[in-house]
Amino acid sequence: TPFVLWVLQGGGLLVALVGLLDDRYTLPVWLRLFVYLASSSVAAVALLNAAPVLIIGLAILALGWTINLVNFMDGLDGFVGTQALSVCLGLGVISLFVPGALGVSHFALVLAGALIPFLVRNWPPARFFMGDSGAVFIGFYLGCVGLYAAGQDNRLGAVWLILMMPFVVDA
């Protein structure tokens, strides 16, 4: 839906901008965390608007954690991009077979399409790097796609969680 698109673009742009400023000037941790949690709050409320307050609170923490998790994992050539591509392709293809979840597929496959050309240049030996701006954006986007998927169908939320396990286990 257009509203979900605005949430992804607005929140993604904000966290990417903070990541870019952090790459350039080394921002204080409290400021980065504040922006990540503020963006996560808006996204969680927007994507899970009918959910109980406890679920939204947990979603905010989970989304903020996903942003930091992906940023933390970024360091090896091709690692984050390949894992994110796997999550997006897996969720995108599986959601094609779930009635009413075509939007989940679209949002997941958009990131997959963006990651493929990036990976061409990020594959070892890397000639192009995502930095904090790219890593936090990918973390935010992956987290939002997971929340959106869970909001559309609980089974898709479980699929997203399973596909994210390489990030979780490696942390």
What does each model-found stretch correspond to?
Residues 1-168:
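"…together with the soluble PPM/PP2C metallo-phosphatase catalytic core" -> "…together
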Residues 171:
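Divalent-cation-assisted or electrostatically stabilized phosphate/pyrophosphate-binding catalytic cores
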